[in-house]
Amino acid sequence: MQVENIRVRLPSGKEVGLVDALNFCYDISDTDFQVLKTLLNSGPKTEDELAEMLHLSKASINRSVNKLVSLGFVDRVKDSSSKGGRPRYIYKPIDADRITTKISNDFKYCADLFSSVIPQELKEK
């Protein structure tokens, strides 16, 4: 599944999109990004609902929501209507503004880190 997005032309001439940058910084795949966008646009969902909406396997959805939870973009809440057996979870995105701020801050942090090592790397023999 390819996520369509705005492309940015880098000084090298290469064009990259947001998913490329998210993949570099967070190891987020196209599928992970599609799951996040779906949750942001459609509200909290279970894995089953996401699998049906996105026409993906539950295993694929499970990997994506676990990645998004570990990164702090999505909260996992136990479904109170779940009776017996394995607990069901509902996945709820954090506020879109918080996600935007987190990603922007992390991009700035990464850029600053790379900028700080350039002088050292250029001087080393």
From Swiss-Prot:
It comes from Saccharolobus solfataricus (strain ATCC 35092 / DSM 1617 / JCM 11322 / P2) (Sulfolobus solfataricus). GO terms for molecular function: DNA binding; DNA-binding transcription factor activity. Residues 19-38 bind DNA. The keyword Nuclease does not apply. The gene is lrs14. Homodimer. Acts in transcription regulation. Binds to multiple sequences in its own promoter. InterPro entries: ArsR-like_HTH (IPR011991), HTH_MarR-typ (IPR000835), Lrs14 (IPR053795), Tscrpt_reg_TrmB_N (IPR002831), WH-like_DNA-bd_sf (IPR036388), WH_DNA-bd_sf (IPR036390). The keyword Membrane does not apply. This is HTH-type transcriptional regulator lrs14. Keywords: Activator, DNA-binding, Repressor, Transcription, Transcription regulation. It comes from the Archaea. Coiled coil: none annotated.
